[in-house]
Amino acid sequence: MGSVPRVLEGERYDQFALESFVKSYWEENSIYRKVKEKSSRAPRKFYFLDGPPYASAKSIHIGTAWNKVVKDVVLRFYRMTGYNVWDKPGYDTHGLPIEVKIEQSLGVRVKREIEEKVGVENFIAACKRFVDENMEAMTRQFKEIGVFMDWENPYVTYRDEYIESGWWLVKKAWEKGLLYKGYRVLHWCPRCETTLADYEVSEYRELEDPSIYVKFPVEGREGEYLLVWTTTPWTLPANAFVMAHPDMEYVKVRVGRDTLILAKARLDHVMREAGVSEYEVLEVLKGSQLEGLRYRHPLEDVVDAQRELSKWHKVVMAPEAVTPHEGSGLVHSAPGHGTIDYEIAQRIGAPVVSLVDERGFMTEAAGKYSGLYFRGEANKAIVEDLRARGALFHAATIVHRYPVCWRCKTPLLLRATTQWFVAVTRLKNQLMREAEKVEWQPGWAKTRFMNMLRELRDWVISRQRYWGIPLPVWRCSSCGYEHVVGSVEELESMGGRRPENLHRPWVDRVELKCPRCGGSMKRVPDVLDVWFDSGIAFYASLGYPRDRETWERLKPVDFIVEGHDQIRGWFFSLLRSGVIGFGETPYRRVLVHGFALDEQGREMHKSLGNYVDFEELIAKVPRDVVRFWVLQNTVWEDLRFSWKGLDLMRRDFNVIWNVYAFASIYMGLDRFDPRRTSLSSVEDSLEVEDRWILSRLASLKRRYLTAMEDLRIHDAARALRSFIIEDVSHWYLRIIRRRVWEEVDTPSKRAAYATLYKVLWEWLLMAAPLIPYTAEYLYIKVFREAEERPEESIHMLDMPEPEDHLIDSTLEEDMEKARMVLEAILSARNEAGLKLRRPVRRVIIAASNPGVEGSLRRLEGLIRLMANAKEIEFAPASALEATRIYRVEPDYGRLGPKYKRDMPKVLRLIEEKGGEIGRVLAEKGVYEGEYEGLPVKLTLEDVSLKAEYPEWLKVRDTPLGLVAVDTRLTKEEVLEGLARDIVRRIQAMRKEAGYSVEDYVEVWIQGGEDVVEAVNALKEYIKRETRALKLEVGEPPSGVEVLREWELDGEKVVIALKRAAASG
């Protein structure tokens, strides 16, 4: 049978060394593979889908580490609760962020240089090399933080088989009539020369732009103008019409010689902003009265496009575009550069003209402004021309939030462009039905997700770039027919040759035979939206459609977790793909986590100097410490990084180590065998503290299992920490030390060992998913032998079963009250300068109600023991009140006018009978009496009343009532305290000398009368507590091994030790 080994005795705790040992152990013994093999035999499946981190850097962000730790905890928990866990990690490898990095490394300034100077083939190869290097570094870091996933077989979005899976979904959308090519206004990055979907427009900067009011002349009305406001002068050359609100009131205002038309609600603001103090309102009219009013464009003679657009120059009603809270109430509309403008133009049949090219420069149709960059050059030239023509009513600047490219940070523009779309708006009802089936944690994430679906727009899936899944659309150069290819086999069946790589430029060289006219078909040059890549991961990572069996066996995904930004990102992409391809949601449960920020709540960026490098972090802080610290944070709230917080958590690990070292050393010393001494065998010997900690353990198991199943990982982490630190270390171990230190084997000691063993073993099993290195080390070094387990890893074991029958809520509540009382006692002791080693005569408890008193009486013996008190006395509050000393200070300002010449008598009365007067005032609020023939009546307004307890009584007012400590010491109590102090010094010297806990010693003590008296009176107690075979008072002989001079209560004491001959 296996007794508990004493392996932790004398071992210097070093968490870094511990984790290094475990890491090597895992690698040398292929522990992950064995854990996975064991999990694969479980009957229930758990399909986890890894939201693939973006492989754009070699060092992972703290937030990415937190993300992977959360995933790892969930996977480890489900393995240990009987699930066959699918744990394939993934990497998101395509897209512009990577292209931008490669452009920078190659010195590429503009997009066309990729083809002209670098070559697409070389560019793609550089992207792949960059991604491969980053994946290798990231994988190493994920392993460092203890993440058990199938790192030998990750899914990688750039691989050909993954690309084919993407083509399958595009084909599916085409077959369902959902794929179409359309001309729409979309956000565009002029540096990257590609479009962005709405959900990609998530980054903004505070930028300065012009803020101008422009006069548009009304046709046929000399001197009358529509006053429009814009912050984008560069869109004015593409103006098609002006928008007004039909229900708003407008005014015609005389300003100098001009008559201006603008919204009544904006009049005062506009005039104040323009510095105009004199103006006259000529007429008030409804916006609907302006409908159809024609105007002339102030720049129509210098903009070629205006020749066609001038036919549409009139006021149209657009309540959705006009607000009384900004501008002039008249909005200039350029349908080629605004989404609402575009929709209104479609409604009224107006042309949609975009006068900005792919690189952000004005086109030839912009006339005079052709070749100017839209921001800066074009804005400046247009404002100057408007001023020169007298069309500029007022010009200023505005600082506002402006969208920038999430990849290169260039300011975006809206422009009309031809793109490929998936008509997900036609699936809106189905998407919302499927989304309702998903379980979200927390609940607000679902609300946000559903609100986003209500604002659904068609999915623009095409991008004008290189490093991405090529859009599988081939167009016939003869008849214009377009065909979507869903696989390489289909490519070959249409006369194409399988390219060596499915990326550009290889796939661009593949020509197909047109099934309609026999002509030659070439692929359209676009690639797919990078969100398409990760959005198909639920089936593409399994090899579908080539491998249909795995998806059919595993579907749906049981669990996904990512940051709350992915509500409109990855979670959305997955749902769209699931409904498009399979008609149903691909996932069942979603957990959302927060962002990792710095201590001030700012995002971490190298440019801000607040970025914490992962390698730096794990060089300074052990991995399990990092894990346990981040896991304490509420999962869906933002995490504020803190070196101090990590340092405090590191101290907790010292406590955890000491708890297990204590158990290992003393159980090993007494050769405790948990297989022989089961809890049931010592049930009759369990003390109240044993039953309490077992109840707390059972409560912990229930709370832990519920929290983990509900994905409230932070609750599980906090419960584990609180239990081992507060319940076990700070309370239970303090109580049972006296039982463990007994020299003889007693039923009480065996009961304490059996209880502590169960507590520490089951806590370790629950903690294993969260602190895998520490749990593995303690399992290998202590519990595997004690448990006689064949499993090589704790992560191959099962979670402990719930034991709700052990929960004693009454006892737990009683003990909580006892702990509160003890805190009050310790506080009172501290005030009196009485260390816990010094016994006190009595503790008086005046409970706030009979229920509290009942709880404390049930644990009276334990309170007396822990408080080191001779007696616990329960008394009413009035008993303590009776000990109070009242001091009365006269208020001369009140009493002087009241008693005048008799004031000296009143003062003598207060001096002589102040205590009595104070007590009466405290009880009744008024004192009445006679002194030297003078009737005296005093109230609380006449005096200042102070009530104090006597110096020897230290009182604490708690929610449970009053707790008082009688600090008067008898001679016996002083000697007991001295004896305890001597024991503590001897134990410190034993440790300093490196003695084993089982070594016996010989002790010599020199000191004053009290010390000598304490040693003689309590010699057997001191010998028992210090394992001393010999204890003598007097000068130590030569040959002692350690000698120290101490000061106890101001008295010098010399203590000398040497190992006794019986120590072996």
From Swiss-Prot:
Motif 'KMSKS' region: positions: 603-607
Classification via SUPFAM superfamilies: Anticodon-binding domain of a subclass of class I aminoacyl-tRNA synthetases, Nucleotidylyl transferase, ValRS/IleRS/LeuRS editing domain
Reaction it catalyzes: tRNA(Ile) + L-isoleucine + ATP = L-isoleucyl-tRNA(Ile) + AMP + diphosphate
Predominant cellular place of this UniProt entry's protein: cytoplasm
Molecular functions (GO terms): aminoacyl-tRNA deacylase activity; ATP binding; isoleucine-tRNA ligase activity; tRNA binding; zinc ion binding
EC identifiers of the protein: 6.1.1.5
InterPro entries according to UniProt: aa-tRNA-synth_Ia (IPR002300), Anticodon_Ile_ABEc (IPR033709), Ile-tRNA-ligase (IPR002301), Ile-tRNA-ligase_type2 (IPR023586), M/V/L/I-tRNA-synth_anticd-bd (IPR013155), Rossmann-like_a/b/a_fold (IPR014729), tRNAsynth_Ia_anticodon-bd (IPR009080), Val/Leu/Ile-tRNA-synth_edit (IPR009008)
A Pfam family: Anticodon_1
Binding site for ATP: 606
Compartment(s) where it occurs, according to its Swiss-Prot or TrEMBL record: Cytoplasm
Superkingdom as given in the UniProt entry: Archaea
Enzyme class, spelled out: ligase
Cofactor(s) this protein cannot do without: Zn(2+)
GO CC annotation, single: cytoplasm
Keywords: Aminoacyl-tRNA synthetase, ATP-binding, Cytoplasm, Ligase, Metal-binding, Nucleotide-binding, Protein biosynthesis, Zinc
Motif ('HIGH' region): 53-64
One Gene Ontology term from the biological process aspect of the record: isoleucyl-tRNA aminoacylation
Subunit structure: Monomer.
Role of this protein: Catalyzes the attachment of isoleucine to tRNA(Ile). As IleRS can inadvertently accommodate and process structurally similar amino acids such as valine, to avoid such errors it has two additional distinct tRNA(Ile)-dependent editing activities. One activity is designated as 'pretransfer' editing and involves the hydrolysis of activated Val-AMP. The other activity is designated 'posttransfer' editing and involves deacylation of mischarged Val-tRNA(Ile).
UniProt record similarity statement: Belongs to the class-I aminoacyl-tRNA synthetase family. IleS type 2 subfamily.
Domain remarks in the Swiss-Prot or TrEMBL record: IleRS has two distinct active sites: one for aminoacylation and one for editing. The misactivated valine is translocated from the active site to the editing site, which sterically excludes the correctly activated isoleucine. The single editing site contains two valyl binding pockets, one specific for each substrate (Val-AMP or Val-tRNA(Ile)).
HAMAP family on file: Ile_tRNA_synth_type2
Protein name as annotated: Isoleucine--tRNA ligase
Top-level taxonomy: Archaea, Thermoproteota, Thermoprotei, Desulfurococcales, Desulfurococcaceae
Primary gene name: ileS
